[in-house]
Amino acid sequence: MKGQRMDGATNPGPLAGVRVVELAGIGPGPFAAMLLADLGADVVRVDRPGAGPLSIEPAYDVTNRNKRSVLVDLKSPEGPGQVLGLVERAQLLIEGYRPGVAERLGVGPDACLARNPALVYGRMTGWGQDGPLAARAGHDIGYTALAGTLGMIGDPDGPPAIPANLLGDYAGGSLYLVVGLLAALHHARETGAGQVVDAAVVDGAAHLTSMLWGLLAAGRWQDRRGVNLLDGGAPCYAVYAASDGGHLAVGALEPQFYAEFSKLVGLEPDAPGQFDVPRWPELRARIAARFATRTLAEWTTVFDGTDACVEPVLSMREAAGHPHLAARGTYTQVDGVTQPAPAPRFSATPGTLRRPPARPGADTAEVARDWGVPALAPR
């Protein structure tokens, strides 16, 4: 893993020239803004006075990389006007307040679009802008629970597994917000008309299950976890423990890959067939017994260079040092902080790391000058 130099002037990224106002929050909003910033957008984060939303040193808040920060008190008489001054010069805005809060602060969609009719106003919430739960507090675990996605993950005989806040906040939230923002930006450039993008984690998390709803309707998926082909129910698509407590992920779905896997893992000829569903428990037990005979490192060597579709389950730090990811530069290190590099990859306009995580208010004077908003300048 190589260190990253903060330099993107010669390769500003595919979103160079796009200005984004991010009203500071936590979770999916900042991550969405980071995605845009990594791709070259000029993201200005509007922080409020006082302690930040995360109780960590700003230098470690990786989701604020490639951004600049201004300090604005939206509850002060001049605060809303300062933000609207930025809005006039922006193409995108991201906010993650509960429904109605931005309006009460004077920076809701109506106020912003009145100042900039071509603005794309992105709203990131868990429950959405309407519906019976819209005003309720919540977090990723609750949103994915209600959307039907959390219940798909885990052992059939235990509680659902919790995939950090990756499935809801970031996959069902941030990524859908970014898709919505960029689609609406395209429309605004074609028509001159902005609009509001209502991105809800429950909607995105539900949308991720589209294929499975088709399988459910076709009778090829059971509406309970841990018994299906892709949720750990199939012995050929599961995680097994090695003799030293390490784990291996097996994804040998196709018959030709399963044949190679069976040979390398040492399954006996009389083992149940790959898709002999009634005998899946027996097959799983046999595979588990084989994996229990060697360490993780030994099994990794056995499967290295094969098409058996078996990989070691790595921790975050282990993943950052894996030779394949190191060769691709999947992870990088900036100022001593290991972090994922921008993704995806672009052949002509690659994403870059141009600035360290923004410190609240540190760029107020610079942004006031660059964006032409003198009302922001510190007095």
Features from the language model and the residues they span:
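N-terminal helix-loop segment corresponding to the beta1-alpha1 unit
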Residues: 2-180, 184-190, 359, 363-379
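Terminal low-complexity tails and localization/encapsulation signals of metabolic enzymes
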Residues: 2-19, 224, 241-243, 318-379
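Conserved Rossmann-fold dehydrogenase catalytic segment
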Residues: 129, 158-168, 189-205, 225-232, ...
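Aromatic-enriched alpha-helical interface/lid elements that frame and gate functional surfaces
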Residues: 231, 235-306, 310
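Conserved PLP cofactor-binding pocket of PLP-dependent enzymes
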Residues: 304-325
